[in-house]
Amino acid sequence: MRMRYALLLILCSAPAAHANDFPTRARVEFVLDCMRSSKAPQQESMYKCSCAIDEIASKVKYATWVDLATVANAITIAGERGGVMRDMKDGRKIAASYRELQAAAKKHCFLNE
């Protein structure tokens, strides 16, 4: 009986571990950047932006998020430096998936409404 209970606890905690692989620093940076661009009052935007990063963290691992963000941001660099990412085979698809992930999180958390 105890073994079943322990196994049940382990299985139920697995999704939470995935959602919590984002470092605190990364979450805070996201929330601060999000709050800066939000037109909502400060406390409201803090809750909505916190919701957004939690939603993103529930969908992708932190390493994947870093890769998506890096490519999406590098594509916007003008000139040859950004050209490396723009010329990459899947660069634009990666950037699009990053934007879709952010848009879904914002919609889920009622950001910019």
Task: Place the predicted regions along the sequence by residue.
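Charge-dense, low-complexity intrinsically disordered segments
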Residues: 21, 43, 88, 92
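Short N-proximal segments of mature Sec-exported proteins
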Residues: 22-77
